[in-house]
């Protein structure tokens, strides 16, 4: 049976895990790290760079490096590279393809099935877009799972049959969620979830960046915000300082040659204390309180009844965040999970559940936001309340607002505001062909169906005529199937190009290594070779040098093979010659040793005898 992986597609970093012998294993990437930066860059030569290599070149290539794209997924945002528009789905797919390649290299087999996680507070459009990103990357997306739910699954699977209440506090690079769950006998039931999709570690970084820009402007009168390359350096320095301040009381940010002024190059040297950092980010910390209180209220659970608190996301390592969680819950967070990996581990376990590898586990998730339609007066009429367990299906009967109304426009919204326009519009469709009738007479049954991925389907039916209309709700950002297929092919072509580039680079490296070894061999032992062999090597070496000066990879391969052959022959000749010389020398030495000692001994005896006489 084909393996399935679990993927935490994060704002800042992503992680992939797989079940091995029933136990989840986090897969290290090609660079040896267990997490991969969610950064994609387009090099000038057309190569697509992902992860650590993309991060390393960001300073010199800021316009063509994309990070934190997860914040844009499910919107109409795009980035223009070389006159081609890339959607958030396509950029996210590049990260997913990198994870897929690394997983396949580790497992030694092709991977198609995956469970991908999303923030619990993602709306329908964001979930759809994440699923599309997976499809573009070549995955069959088995399930979209909420990150806190995956974390609870990873935490709670081995906790036995005792019923317990768990709070998951998930503060990642770009999003924030709080979820309350109940665990008992393999059943993981989400009671409530709340969050903020625009709050995360990136915002803490931005406060440091703003502080550095303001400080530098005050000292030198130069606005670094106008310099893209300088801003990329500030971004990296801010992230590093934030991490340092989690362990140290101060962090020194020293960036030489950050820009140039009238008198020459200028340097940035600023020290930030932890207290100063916490002051400038206090309002961000305060924003964490609202979703926490909402989740507790919706669950109908007292804070004192929470038995375990799990921290998820790298941003929870900040001391101020840990302290806030202690204040809000009255208990120390659980230290037994890795906040960077626990979500991917949970996703792998859910993949195992869906594949039948993990038994006796039932995951009951909820929809994070209420769903409904717009009714007369612009009112938002809810059909499914937030925190309803999914999958679920609800129906309600509506009627017409005007006499002889020939059609009904169904506008679907997601949110909590009473006025429809203030909520997130998911889509619109029309039920046509209604027979003439006084207003209030037609009976229009509207049914909402949410699947286990949290993706919505809507169905409207005129009970009088039997006419009906169905739609899978797709936000304005969602892509038609043919676009997903086109993007998938495009991504595969890029992957093939990248593979070819890697192979070409490896061929060139191997050829250059042989060239160097052969030159060294000639310098050290060339005078010991027959003239004919030496001439053959020099001729083949010249061919390889010439090939390496061009771009024809086949020519390099051919020249490499020829040089390898003649070098090997010459090496064998030299080895045989040296063995013969060594054997002759050993024979002479053995003869000398056989006669020499006897002569010496005889002489000594004679001398002794003479002395005695």
UniProtKB/Swiss-Prot annotation:
Q: Does the keyword Acetylation apply?
A: no
Q: Name one Pfam family in it.
A: HSP70
Residue spans of biased composition, Polar residues class: 567-576
Q: What induces it?
A: By stress conditions e.g. heat shock.
Low complexity: bias regions: 577-598
Listed A to Z, the keywords are: ATP-binding, Chaperone, Nucleotide-binding, Phosphoprotein, Stress response
**UniProt-recorded Gene Ontology molecular function terms:** ATP binding; ATP-dependent protein folding chaperone; unfolded protein binding
Residue ranges of region Disordered?
Answer: 487-509, 567-613
For the modification Phosphothreonine, the affected residues are: 175
The organism's place on the tree of life at top rank: Bacteria
Q: What does this protein do?
A: Acts as a chaperone.
The record's section on PANTHER family has: HEAT SHOCK PROTEIN 70KDA
Entry's family note: Belongs to the heat shock protein 70 family.
Q: What is this protein called?
A: Chaperone protein DnaK
- Lineage per the UniProt record: Bacteria, Bacillati, Actinomycetota, Actinomycetes, Micromonosporales
Supply the gene name.
dnaK
């Amino acid at each position: 049976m084909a393996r399935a992986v679990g993927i935490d597609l994060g704002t800042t970093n992503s992680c992939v895990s797989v079940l091995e012998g029933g136990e989840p294993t986090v897969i290290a990437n090609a660079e040896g790290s267990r997490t991969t930066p969610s950064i994609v860059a387009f090099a000038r030569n057309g190569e697509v760079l992902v992860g650590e290599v993309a991060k390393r070149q960001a300073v010199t290539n800021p316009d063509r490096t994309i990070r934190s794209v997860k914040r844009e997924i499910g919107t109409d945002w795009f980035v223009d590279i070389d006159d081609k528009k890339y959607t958030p789905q396509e950029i996210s797919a590049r990260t997913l393809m990198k994870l897929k390649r690394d997983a396949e290299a580790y497992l030694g087999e092709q991977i198609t099935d995956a469970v991908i996680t999303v923030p619990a507070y993602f709306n329908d459009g964001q979930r759809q877009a994440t699923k599309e990103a997976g499809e573009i990357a070549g995955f069959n997306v088995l399930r979209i799972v909420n990150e806190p739910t995956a974390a609870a699954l990873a935490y709670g699977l081995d906790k036995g049959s005792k019923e317990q209440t768990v709070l998951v506090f998930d503060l990642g690079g770009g999003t924030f969620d709080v979820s309350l769950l109940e665990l008992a006998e393999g059943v993981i039931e989400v009671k409530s979830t709340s969050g903020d999709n625009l709050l995360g570690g990136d915002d803490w970084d931005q406060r440091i960046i703003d502080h550095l820009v303001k400080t530098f402007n005050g000292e030198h009168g130069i606005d670094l915000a106008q310099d893209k390359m300088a801003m990329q350096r500030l971004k990296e320095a801010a992230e590093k300082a934030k991490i340092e301040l989690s362990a140290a009381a101060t962090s020194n940010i020293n960036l030489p040659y950050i820009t140039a002024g009238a008198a020459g190059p200028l340097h940035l040297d600023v020290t930030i204390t932890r207290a100063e950092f916490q002051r400038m980010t206090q309002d961000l910390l305060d924003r964490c309180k609202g979703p926490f209180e909402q989740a507790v209220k919706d669950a109908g659970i007292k804070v004192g009844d929470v038995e375990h608190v799990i921290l998820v996301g790298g941003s929870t390592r900040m001391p101020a965040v840990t302290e806030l969680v202690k204040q809000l819950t009255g208990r120390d967070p659980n230290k037994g999970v890795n906040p960077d990996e626990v979500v991917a581990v949970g996703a792998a376990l859910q993949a195992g559940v869906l594949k039948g590898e993990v038994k006796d586990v039932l995951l009951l998730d909820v929809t994070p936001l209420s769903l409904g339609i717009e009714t007369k007066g612009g009112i938002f009429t809810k059909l499914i309340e937030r925190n309803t367990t999914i999958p679920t299906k609800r129906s309600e009967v509506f009627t017409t607002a005007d006499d002889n109304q020939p059609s009904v426009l169904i506008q679907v919204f997601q949110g909590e505001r009473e006025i429809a326009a203030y909520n997130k519009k998911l889509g619109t469709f029309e039920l046509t062909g209604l027979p003439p009738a006084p207003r209030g007479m037609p009976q229009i049954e509207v049914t909402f169906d949410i699947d286990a991925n949290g993706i919505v389907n809507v169905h409207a039916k005129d009970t009088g005529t039997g006419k009906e209309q169905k739609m899978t709700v797709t936000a304005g950002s969602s892509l038609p199937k043919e676009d997903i297929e086109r993007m998938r092919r495009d991504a595969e072509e890029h992957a093939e190009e990248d593979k070819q580039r890697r192979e070409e680079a490896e061929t060139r490296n191997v050829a250059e290594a042989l060239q160097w070894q052969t030159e060294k061999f000639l310098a050290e032992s060339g005078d010991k070779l027959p003239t004919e062999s030496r001439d053959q090597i020099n001729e083949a070496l010249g061919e390889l040098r010439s090939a390496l000066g061009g771009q024809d990879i086949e020519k390099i391969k051919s020249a490499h093979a020829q040089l390898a052959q003649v070098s090997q022959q010459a090496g064998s000749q030299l080895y045989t010659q040296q063995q013969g010389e060594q054997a002759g020398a050993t024979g002479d030495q053995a003869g000398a040793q056989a006669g020499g000692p006897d002569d010496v001994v005889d002489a000594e005896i004679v001398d002794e005898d003479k002395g005695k006489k």
